[in-house]
Amino acid sequence: METLVSSIFWTLAPWKNMLLLKHGRIEILDQNTMYGWYELPKQEFLNSKQPVQIFTTKKYWILFRIGPERRRKAGMPTGVYYIEFTR
């Protein structure tokens, strides 16, 4: 089972439903768009002392790491960290 490595720092507060990401690129899957992604420049992460707020939502999301086999199958770069959101 894969785990989130230290280069990714996230907090999902169920009472605020806010995702905070410290480093990496995320892929967002939801029932409306089924696809979306957001990426911040590496330097912005290095200069930031606080996690970066990516988005807020009224829904509660559970985070999973997308494994390397699935990334290769989908044509995603393997050197970038992706996070999949499901309900």
UniProtKB/Swiss-Prot annotation:
Subcellular location as annotated: Plastid, Chloroplast
Name used for this protein in its record: Putative uncharacterized protein ycf15
InterPro entries recorded: Uncharacterised_Ycf15 (IPR019645)
Organism: Solanum tuberosum (Potato)
Protein keywords: Chloroplast, Plastid
Pfam families given in the database record: Ycf15
GO cellular component: chloroplast
Family affiliation: Belongs to the ycf15 family.
Predominant cellular place of this UniProt entry's protein: plastid
